[in-house]
């Protein structure tokens, strides 16, 4: 596991936060810095067919070291970090041999507590890498990046049989654009794994169907003293819309396979208001029903408005549940599960209450379930990763490569 932690700490030192609402891909210059660094490291490692596209997708190949009809497989991670929390001047803390209890994050009042995050009870004796309470850590997904790079080094430096190993590093995954410019044909893998999961053992092949809902409300503002019968308050209409959305079907009230409506932002004045929702559901029929529900609500609240006042609703699908594509190729999951068991890890098949690049790639002809990274509490100041979890991820990647080679020989 030479240089695994060193690589990770180097990668998180670079601010690669992506930005939503930007046309260019990658959306931020910082992502280019990490992509160019990785390209240089791949070249130094001796990989071939290294390309960095104008849209920031970095691809490379570790050639097979054995003969046979061995399928080419891929491993993919994203270089950007979430726009939800600052990724600038990340200052990681290394807690060796965690003994339990609260971990102070920096010099302020912030702590990482097992009361709020009970998973810490399972990590006694391990080495934790945390934030200083001022930024996110960036384990999502620089842990995955470091693990893939380290696995390549292990495969390159040891006589472990493997076929062609394709790797890719993508930008803007956190803003939903990571896979849009991914050339599956150029990548050349029969299947792949994103390394973008959470705790040790996670193996995910089901994710939400996802859509965004943007609502524009145009009202009419006049002096409140003479407003009767004339004023149309856009903010009041927004409140009425949200009151119609099922309150018990929100992120904070759902879990497992339950879907939700999430009001992500709302702004406005009496004259004009905007609302942004996201819709999520694992079941395609329920997903379509949720979209219809939003349209019905907008129609109901907007009924009888003055012609100059209106509610405009735009729904855009973001990605779909990759399950229907991955289950067509059960050996992809079988190999990953066997690799975990061979590394003394119990596979934990669970749905992703979110999405990955792999969801989009699966519908582009590259079946792509998701492997764990050893990270927790993504997108915020309580994010952390365990060194042991990262080492396990490297072992699983290497073992997947070895098992795939055995199938083809």
Curated annotation (Swiss-Prot):
Classification via InterPro entries: ArgE/DapE_CS, Bact_exopeptidase_dim_dom, Peptidase_M20, Peptidase_M20_dimer, Peptidase_M20B
Binding locations of Zn(2+) 2: 140, 174, 379
Cross-referenced Pfam families: M20_dimer, Peptidase_M20
Domain of life assignment: Bacteria
Annotated GO CC locations: cytosol
Binding residue positions for Zn(2+) 1: 78, 140, 196
CDD domains found in the cross-reference section: M20_peptT (cd03892)
Matching SUPFAM superfamilies: Bacterial exopeptidase dimerisation domain (SSF55031), Zn-dependent exopeptidases (SSF53187)
Record note on cofactor: Binds 2 Zn(2+) ions per subunit.
Signal peptide: none
Protein location: Cytoplasm
Protein name, as recorded: Peptidase T
Lineage: Bacteria, Pseudomonadati, Pseudomonadota, Gammaproteobacteria, Enterobacterales
């Amino acid at each position: 596991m030479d240089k695994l932690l060193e690589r990770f700490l180097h990668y998180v030192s670079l601010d690669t936060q992506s930005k939503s609402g930007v046309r260019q891909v990658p959306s931020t210059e910082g992502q280019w810095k990490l992509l160019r660094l990785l390209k240089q490291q791949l070249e130094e490692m001796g990989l071939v067919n290294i390309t960095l596209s104008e849209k920031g997708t970095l691809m490379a190949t570790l050639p097979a070291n054995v003969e046979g009809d061995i399928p080419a497989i891929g491993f993919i991670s994203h270089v950007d970090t979430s726009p939800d929390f600052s990724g600038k001047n990340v200052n990681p803390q290394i807690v060796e041999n965690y003994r339990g209890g609260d971990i102070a994050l920096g010099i302020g009042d912030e702590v990482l507590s097992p009361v709020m995050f009970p998973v810490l009870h399972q990590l006694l004796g391990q080495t934790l890498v945390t934030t200083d309470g001022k930024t996110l850590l960036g384990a999502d997904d620089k842990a995955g990046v470091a693990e893939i790079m380290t696995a390549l080094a292990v495969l390159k430096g040891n006589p472990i049989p493997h076929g062609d190993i394709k790797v890719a590093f993508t930008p803007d995954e956190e803003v939903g654009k990571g896979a849009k410019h991914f050339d599956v044909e150029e990548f050349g893998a029969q299947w792949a794994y994103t390394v973008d999961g959470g705790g040790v053992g996670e193996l995910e092949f089901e994710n939400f169907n996802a859509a965004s809902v943007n609502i524009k409300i145009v009202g009419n503002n006049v002096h409140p003293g003479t407003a009767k019968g004339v004023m149309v308050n856009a903010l009041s209409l927004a409140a009425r819309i949200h009151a119609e959305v099922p309150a018990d079907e929100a992120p904070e009230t759902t879990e497992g396979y339950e879907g939700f409506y999430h009001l992500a932002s709302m702004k406005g004045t009496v004259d004009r208001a905007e609302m942004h929702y996201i819709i999520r559901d694992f079941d395609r029929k329920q997903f379509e029903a949720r979209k219809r529900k939003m349209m019905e609500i907008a129609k109901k609240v907007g009924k009888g408005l003055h012609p100059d006042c209106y509610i405009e609703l735009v729904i855009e699908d973001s990605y779909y549940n990759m399950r229907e594509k991955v289950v067509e190729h059960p050996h992809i999951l079988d190999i990953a599960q066997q690799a975990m068991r061979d590394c003394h890890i119990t596979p934990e098949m669970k749905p992703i209450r979110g999405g990955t690049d792999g969801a989009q790639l699966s519908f582009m002809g590259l079946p792509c379930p998701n492997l764990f990274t050893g990270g927790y509490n993504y997108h915020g100041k309580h994010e952390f990763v365990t060194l042991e979890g990262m080492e396990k991820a490297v072992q699983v990647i290497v073992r997947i490569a070895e098992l795939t080679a055995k199938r083809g020989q």
